[in-house]
Amino acid sequence: TITGDHRLIQYLLNFSRPFIYTTAMPLHAAVTIQFAIEMLSDTKEREILQSNITYFKEMVEHFKLQDIFINSASPIQSAVFASPARVKEVTMKLKERNFDAKPILSPTVPLGQERIRFCVHSYNTYDEIQEILFLLSTFV
């Protein structure tokens, strides 16, 4: 249901007919989307990304950081700290060493659960992953 004045209703009736009277996605759109999904799931980049995520998690354990990291299988990994000041301090130290980790502060997350977000990419090297986690281990 759409509410509005007479002019709005008339405009929508006259210029939105394909949307108003359509009940399903066109077949060609569904086929295109399916093809895109298949292409994305079969790419070498995706395999490399998954390998990097696995390596990141292994290095978290190697450097004994699992107590601060949220368990996640996604490319977005988060280390939780008890204070926003500590998150800012550690993030700044990482930036000084050319690592782009992002602080996530309250009110985006609950107070006392501030965190540093790490985004793992397919183009990251194992050396980069190891170095950032080594640095993090020296800062915590």
Show the residue positions of the predicted features.
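Active-site PLP attachment segment
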Residues: 1-11
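Cytosolic Rossmann-like ligand/nucleotide-binding regulatory domains
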Residues: 104-105
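Structural motif of enzymes handling amino- and sulfur-group chemistry
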Residues: 24-42, 48, 52, 61
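Conserved PLP-binding catalytic core of the aspartate aminotransferase-like
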Residues: 45-57, 61-98, 108, 113, ...
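Predominant activation on well-ordered alpha-helical scaffold segments within soluble catalytic domains
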Residues: 9-13, 30-37, 54-57, 133
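Active-site PLP-lysine loop of aminotransferase-like
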Residues: 12-25
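Short amphipathic alpha-helices in soluble, non-transmembrane regions
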Residues: 90-95, 131-137
